[in-house]
Amino acid sequence: MRQIRSPRALRVIPLTALMLISGCGEKEQVSSATPPPDVGVYTVRAQALTLTTDLPGRTSAFRVAEVRPQVSGILQKRSFVEGAEVKLGQQLYQIDPRTYEAQLRRAEANRTSAQNLARRYETLLKTKAVSKQQYDDALAAWKQAEADYQVARIDVQYTRVLSPISGRIGRSTVTEGALVTNGQAQSLATVTQLDPIYVDVTQPITKLLGLQKALESGRLQKTGENQAEVSLTLDDGSAYPLPGTLKFSEVSVDPTTGSVTLRAEFPNPNRKLLPGMFVHALLKEGVQNAAILVPQQAISRDTRGVPSVWVVKADNTVESREIQTLRTVGNAWLISNGVTEGERIITEGVQRVRSGIAVNAVEAKNVNLVDGFAATTEASAN
């Protein structure tokens, strides 16, 4: 027997359906009313940028002189304090001079005798009492005696061992009473001139050639009178206060490393720099007139390592765009293409965006580019 449904039940079904449809509509309205995510953006700008290269290096003394005896004898006295500053020509040691003083007196006597004989023969030659050959022999003997006298006098002077340069003297390797000899292998002490001081750094030849090409093509401009200026950072991270000057580059390339050595000279009045210290030298390369820097936090890389940024377009929608990075400059990347001046790139809220969605873009607070991004007046003029 077929069951007949109540008209009341039939009226309930459409009502329930209407309620369900109404609920779905409310959810769609709520979903469509969700505001776009907030993101922080950095507006790209192009400015002149002074490019620099940070190269590791070591300090080396401006002059180094080993003190050695030039005559043999017993060391009588040491006349300096180890580790002190000495001047050019300052006496450092005294070698027993008695033997050399006696040789000087003998040489002086021989010189006087030869001189008197030569003058006597000169008078006798006028009267033909001696031959011309005898006179010439006497004159040559006089000159020989004069040379022997000068050698003996120099040997006496060499008993006073003097500093060959001005600088700081190290420890003495001998004491009073020691026998020293002319030409001995061991030096008596070493004097090192510390002001100024050299800094030797190495640069790959490929980078040096690339820099030369960039300057020749006009992509980089010279920085002007300060092109050869070098600044220094010590091993503990502190900056050396006095600038240096690039003096020369080596004329050959090291075949084992493919690098060329550059030498800079720094004033060192307080002797803060000592030979053998590890340092970083900052060399100016040139000025790029329309450099574009992108904050590091704006760049992401895919599985292939290709860098990209999120760009906010004029309609506030976003798109991912690949860029080409050249080098780091402080906390930013210098790029060659991918974005242009005036475009906005996302630096905050990157995790909330995907391609094509609309965003609410505000100026980012986490962007703090390096001070070097703003060009100096001098760099702009060049």
Swiss-Prot record:
Stretches assigned to coiled coil: 98-127
Primary location group: membrane
Cellular compartments annotated: Cell inner membrane
Lipidation (N-palmitoyl cysteine): C24
Entry's Gene Ontology cellular component terms: plasma membrane
Lipidation (S-diacylglycerol cysteine): C24
Pfam families found in the cross-reference section: CusB_dom_1, HlyD_D23
Keyword entries, A-Z: Cell inner membrane, Cell membrane, Coiled coil, Lipoprotein, Membrane, Palmitate, Signal, Transport
Extent of the signal sequence: 1-23
One GO biological process term: response to antibiotic
Membrane topology: Lipid-anchor
InterPro entries from the UniProt entry: CusB-like_dom_1, CusB_D23, MFP_Efflux, RND_pump_MFP
PROSITE patterns xrefs: PROKAR_LIPOPROTEIN
Its job: The periplasmic linker protein component of an organic solvent efflux pump. Involved in export of a number of low log POW compounds including hexane (log POW 3.5), toluene (log POW 2.5) and dimethylphthalate (log POW 2.3). The solvent resistance phenotype has been postulated to depend on the operon expression level.
PANTHER family: ACRA/E-RELATED COMPONENT OF DRUG EFFLUX TRANSPORTER, MULTIDRUG EFFLUX PUMP SUBUNIT ACRA-RELATED
Membership in a protein family: Belongs to the membrane fusion protein (MFP) (TC 8.A.1) family.
The protein's name: Solvent efflux pump periplasmic linker SrpA
Organism name: Pseudomonas putida
Lineage: Bacteria, Pseudomonadati, Pseudomonadota, Gammaproteobacteria, Pseudomonadales
